[in-house]
Amino acid sequence: MNKDNLVGFFTRIPKFFGRGVNIGRVITLSALSLIFLVCLYYLLGMAVIHKIDDDVDFQPNQSNPGESRTIAMAISLIDREVSKNGWVANDPFFMPGYLLDNMPNYQQGIIYAISRFAMEMTDQIGRSRGSSEVDSDLDKASGLLKYPGTTWIFDLSTSIAPTASSEAQYKSAMRSLISYNKRLGEGTATFDKRADNLQATLRRFAADLGSNSAAISEHLASSGGWGIDSKADNIFYSAKGRLYAYYLLLRELAADFRDVVSGKELSASWNLMLESLKQASRLDPAVIANGQPDGAVVPSHLASLGFYLLRARTQLREIIDILEK
């Protein structure tokens, strides 16, 4: 195509679309259409992805005789949140999950509680009287579960090279827990079901609930009252995730330590503690408001969650006291 033909081609474009076509208007409409499609992509994507999975009747995958039900629950929770529901806390900007905040905080709360349990398994329950060698699978899982939940396959703040994502680390931790539980069923791993081990585990959980309660109280004191609070939902769902995971782990821990629970006549106290955690897990307001704790018009959902949290912690302390006797 020579120069004259090329010029003629471009001069005929307006005639093709009709006389009086405004090229600027076409560009503007195209840009607006693109913006609309991008917004639709994010909004629909967020609606599809978003899920606060707080099923209090959730059951672990079937464990074999001799295996730990609590470990099986930890495995099932990791698998559900990472593989089935999809981990969203580290979604990059071009994915709809990037704009979510409730689900990421909730998922990270769950993983945090599991990591606390894994630490106790490594330090106490997975060893004979705390003096034997640390179990390699438990040690590996405990370390991997501490990995930040917001790391994608690239972390430009540290390096331009690819790195291990949060999902990859948590799946690796899950495989280590599966390996440990399998060896436990085969009789080649330790699960020391002594009362003092249970006591130490409950004490660690209670301490974590205490720090969580302090964070809620501090936030209520500094920003509560008006109901509009952009940080309240982050704190709420992070705490809810922890409490939900603790509820499920403690429910199964009672089965693993059934002889201690029955021998110390803890069943009634244990069930009351579980009920407090269950009530906290079921809190599901459409919008998180942070009004006054005694507000008649604008409630404080953080205060409501904090109430159940403190009650569960108090009941845990009572169980710990009974175990000391």
Task: Specify the residue positions occupied by each region the protein language model found.
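Hydrophobic single-pass membrane-insertion segments
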Residues: 40-55
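A cross-kingdom marker for long, charged
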Residues: 58-61, 244-325
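N-terminal Lys/Arg-rich, disordered targeting/topogenic segments
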Residues: 1-22
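Extended amphipathic alpha-helical interaction segments
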Residues: 163-275, 279-282
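Long, amphipathic, charge-rich alpha-helical segments that form helical bundles/coiled-coils
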Residues: 137-158, 166-178, 269-294
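Hydrophobic membrane-insertion alpha-helices, especially the h-region
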Residues: 28-43
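A cross-kingdom feature marking solvent-exposed beta-strand/loop segments within repeated
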Residues: 93-102, 155-158, 224-233, 286-304
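N-terminal Sec/ER secretory leader and immediately downstream segment
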Residues: 54-159
